[in-house]
């Protein structure tokens, strides 16, 4: 016995002891999680940036990160009023400075009065600062033409993502054939597939129609639901509008049809509406699911369960790092709503600076305020430039042989389809890569352009895409698009 103990001690001294936590012994659901937006291509982009800093010669001088919707990382300037008020909230000593307009000072004082200890450094209640929840409710009422919004149904969150995960946690239950199924659009934002994998739910894919500008077809919802009921219990339907990664904006008629479908099939609706300010195409208009639902009247308005999400990260603000967001729940069971608050309480509260920023987004300067003119000019300039970039992206890609791109009606991305030669597909398979992953890796290595392969979002079999943000400055975007088109032509020739 003593000898055995001595052997173990010697093994420990020599570093031979096995790890308690190993890949084989860790949570298998975590191993199944994939998040393409920050996946292997992005890791390689980071390595290339490091190599460039070290003086390693490359066929390019910089890595262009067109993989993620992070506006300020791509050079967009913050909106002055938002940052002025935040600066005053973070450092109240500045309230006596003549360098800040009076309306910014009043807004900062109002927010600080609602904070514990009159400081952004204090925790808030778990559902968010009450004053800000009330301002969010008033914003929703204005947006939806006066339809009432109850601040008690508004929960602030760490970006929209945190709220989406929380609602999905409430929905997931059962084992085997009774496991919860969630219908998600394909292509989809990988937060959904990653969260469902982590929670052990069943991902139920419904395909958007690329031939009709990524339209949502209720017949396709019926197909997906019918097939899913053989192996799980579908309980929820997610819609992303405007679309990520596909950039489409749903019509009111489509939203009404989706609501009727969800009601008839007893599905909880999740409306991811974080790009509601990002609508560019003539004839396109954002319609909130809440507004359409309420205007449909009974039985839908009083019974269909809905959670709708918004964020400070997108829109004209692009304030990703502050992690501000909210969810409004409609027709949710009161007892379940208390359970949602309990879940949020475990994480204490959303970041208070993010809550403050959200307040400024939902209640911007009024026309009579000193900051209004500058605020409005900056906001419109951002949205006008995004609209120009959306049009340019569509135009350049559709002029390139072997690339086709649907109109970027909204959001911040294009999702072009690329033709890949059979020999390129075979080479990718030899390397154990998805064909579009192979294409995107080669693109990165030869041009420094970082985009995300369509396989990370889901796509119909035999088709290949990539997602690219439209956020780089206009002239840089023009060069990027031309460079990408030339690379595709060269790649096609190489493997023909």
Swiss-Prot record:
It is found in: Cytoplasm. One of its GO terms (biological process) is biosynthetic process. Its cofactor is pyridoxal 5'-phosphate. One of its GO terms (cellular component) is cytosol. Pathway: Amino-acid degradation; L-alanine degradation via transaminase pathway; pyruvate from L-alanine: step 1/1. The modification N6-(pyridoxal phosphate)lysine is found at residue 314. The modification Phosphothreonine is found at residue 22. It comes from the Eukaryota. The modification N-acetylalanine is found at residue 2. InterPro entries: ALAT1/2-like, Aminotransferase_I/II_large, PyrdxlP-dep_Trfase, PyrdxlP-dep_Trfase_major, PyrdxlP-dep_Trfase_small. It is an enzyme of class 2 (transferase). Induction: By glucocorticoids. Keywords: Acetylation, Aminotransferase, Cytoplasm, Phosphoprotein, Pyridoxal phosphate, Transferase. Catalyzes the reversible transamination between alanine and 2-oxoglutarate to form pyruvate and glutamate. Participates in cellular nitrogen metabolism and also in liver gluconeogenesis starting with precursors transported from skeletal muscles. PANTHER family: ALANINE AMINOTRANSFERASE, ALANINE AMINOTRANSFERASE 1. This is Alanine aminotransferase 1. It comes from Homo sapiens (Human).
């Amino acid at each position: 016995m003593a000898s055995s103990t001595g052997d173990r001690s010697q093994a420990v001294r020599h570093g031979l002891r096995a790890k308690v936590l190993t890949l084989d012994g860790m949570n298998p659901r975590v191993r199944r999680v994939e998040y393409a937006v920050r996946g292997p291509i992005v890791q390689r982009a980071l390595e290339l940036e490091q190599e460039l800093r070290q003086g390693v010669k490359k066929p390019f001088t910089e890595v262009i990160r067109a993989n993620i919707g992070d506006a300020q990382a791509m050079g967009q300037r913050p909106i002055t009023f938002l940052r002025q008020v935040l600066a005053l909230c973070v450092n109240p000593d500045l309230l006596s400075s003549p360098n800040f307009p009076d309306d910014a000072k009043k807004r900062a004082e109002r927010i600080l009065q609602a904070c514990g200890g009159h400081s952004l450094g204090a925790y808030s209640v778990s559902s968010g600062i009450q004053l800000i929840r009330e301002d969010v409710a008033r914003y929703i009422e204005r947006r939806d033409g006066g339809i009432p919004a109850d601040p008690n149904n508004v929960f602030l969150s760490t970006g929209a993502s945190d709220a989406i995960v929380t609602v999905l946690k409430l929905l997931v239950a059962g084992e085997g054939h009774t496991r919860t199924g969630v219908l998600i659009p394909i292509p989809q934002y990988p937060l959904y597939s990653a969260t469902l994998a982590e929670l052990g739910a069943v991902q139920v894919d419904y395909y958007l129609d690329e031939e009709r500008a990524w339209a949502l077809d209720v017949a396709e919802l019926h197909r997906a639901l019918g097939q899913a009921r053989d192996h799980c219990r579908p309980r929820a339907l997610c819609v992303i509008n405007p679309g990520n990664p596909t950039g489409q904006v749903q019509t009111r008629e489509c939203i009404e049809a989706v609501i009727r479908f969800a009601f008839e099939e007893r599905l909880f609706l999740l409306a991811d509406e974080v790009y509601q300010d990002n609508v560019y195409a003539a004839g396109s208009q954002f319609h909130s699911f809440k507004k359409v639902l309420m205007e449909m009247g009974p039985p839908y308005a009083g019974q269909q369960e809905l959670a709708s999400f918004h964020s400070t990260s997108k829109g004209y603000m692009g304030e990703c790092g502050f992690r501000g967001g909210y969810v409004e729940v409609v027709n949710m069971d009161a007892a379940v709503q208390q359970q949602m608050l309990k879940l949020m309480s475990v994480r204490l509260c959303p970041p208070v600076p993010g809550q403050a920023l959200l307040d400024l987004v939902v209640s911007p300067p009024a026309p009579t305020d000193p900051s209004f003119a500058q605020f409005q000019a900056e906001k419109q300039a951002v949205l006008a430039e995004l609209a120009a970039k959306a049009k340019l992206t569509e135009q350049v890609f559709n002029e390139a042989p072997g690339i086709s791109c649907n109109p970027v009606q909204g959001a911040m991305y294009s999702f072009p389809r690329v033709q890949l030669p059979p020999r390129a597909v075979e080479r990718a398979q030899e390397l154990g890569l998805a064909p579009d992953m192979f294409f995107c890796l080669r693109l990165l290595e030869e041009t420094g352009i970082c985009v995300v392969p369509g396989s990370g979002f889901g796509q119909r079999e035999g088709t290949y895409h990539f997602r690219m943000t439209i956020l780089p400055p206009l002239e840089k975007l023009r060069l990027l698009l031309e460079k990408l088109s030339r690379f595709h032509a060269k790649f096609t020739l190489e493997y023909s």
